């Protein structure tokens, strides 16, 4: 059985806001092949149809080979990972779909799903910085901000599968930045990709000589450009420092919550490493003294961590079902 597990292949589907990625991973965490497909702002049912078309294409007519052991899916929104139900894509669009059952019946394989951040947390547990930890927090700082909590080796999902929405905790940066949730000054409203864009627009009037490009017509401020002008633009410096302080405050609060020995930072805002030392220098060393494995950047490729996470759902789901 162990040799069979080593030879097993796991299919993964990672649905993001702008792209869909389908891939195949071996039991050691190596992506064997993958394919990108266009996505967009979809309803859940339209997204499921897109997933089915992409899988049919990837599998050359929808026929998994004999080595395929399971399908794993990572989705945005709220997921009942126990039953494999996609409960909602966001708080304003709820349409519970039994995605795991539908895909399992279509492709003849067991299917397991979770939201995107908990999926990435599983990838960290299996193949990343969390391999040697039973008490870990993975914090994703990207378009939004959320976290996966591992406590005594178990990933926390919550009573309503909504655990980890830490982006909607207070940032400690009090200048009344509006957040999508309706509260001001959430961490996500200050330090996420969307939050940095919103803050740049709110603060730009104070800095008429800024070098930062503020796009019109639905474009978003480039976080990379904000960081690039940190040394020569006051607006960019304020945006960066506020984001770093908000993330540091979040880390120090979460440390008190679940007592982790490891904290892993990932997501697009953290991916180039520029913000990381600025976060570290704002941490109170006494507060983080028990984080003995450190506060570290993910060592998984940020381009593929979502797909690795989806495949990891398949690995862990198959293990639990055995």
Question: Where in the sequence are the language-model features?
Answer:
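ATP-binding/phosphotransfer module of carbohydrate and carboxylate kinases, centering on a glycine-rich
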Residues: 1-70, 79-83, 101-109, 126-133, ...
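A short acidic/small-residue loop/turn micro-motif
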Residues: 38-40, 94, 162-165
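General beta-strand structural signal in soluble alpha/beta enzymes
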Residues: 111-115
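Glycine/small-residue-rich loop that forms an oxyanion/phosphate-binding "nest" at active or ligand-binding sites
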Residues: 118
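Glycine-rich phosphate-binding loop of actin/hexokinase-like ATP-binding domains
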Residues: 133-190
């Amino acid at each position: 059985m162990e040799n069979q597990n080593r030879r097993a292949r796991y299919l993964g589907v990672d649905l993001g806001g702008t792209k869909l990625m389908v891939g195949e991973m071996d039991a050691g965490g190596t992506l064997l092949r993958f394919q990108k497909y266009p996505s967009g702002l979809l309803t859940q049912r339209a997204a499921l149809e897109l997933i089915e078309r992409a899988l049919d294409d990837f599998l050359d007519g929808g026929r998994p080979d004999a080595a395929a052991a399971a399908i794993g899916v990572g989705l945005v929104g709220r997921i009942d990972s126990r039953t494999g139900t996609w409960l909602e894509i966001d708080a304003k669009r709820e349409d519970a779909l039994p995605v795991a059952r539908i895909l399992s019946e279509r492709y003849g394989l067991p299917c397991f799903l979770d939201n995107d951040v908990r999926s990435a947390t599983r990838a960290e547990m299996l193949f990343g910085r969390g391999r040697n930890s039973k008490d870990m927090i993975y914090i994703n700082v990207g378009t939004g901000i959320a976290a996966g909590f591992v406590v005594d080796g178990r990933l926390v999902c919550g009573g309503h599968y909504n655990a980890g929405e830490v982006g909607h905790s207070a940032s400690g940066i009090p200048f009344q930045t509006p957040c999508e949730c309706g509260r001001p000054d959430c961490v996500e409203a200050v330090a996420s990709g969307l939050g940095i864009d919103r803050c740049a627009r709110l603060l730009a009037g104070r800095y008429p000589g800024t070098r930062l490009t503020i796009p019109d017509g639905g474009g978003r401020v480039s976080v990379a450009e904000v960081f690039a002008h940190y040394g020569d633009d006051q607006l960019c410096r304020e945006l960066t420092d506020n984001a770093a302080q908000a993330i540091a405050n979040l880390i120090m609060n979460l440390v008190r919550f679940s007592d982790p020995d490891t904290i892993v930072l990932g997501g697009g805002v953290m991916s180039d490493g520029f913000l990381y030392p600025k976060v570290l220098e704002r941490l109170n060393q006494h507060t983080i003294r028990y984080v003995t494995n450190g506060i570290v950047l993910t060592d998984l490729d940020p381009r593929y961590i979502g797909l690795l996470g989806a495949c990891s759902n398949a690995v862990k789901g198959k293990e639990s079902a055995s």
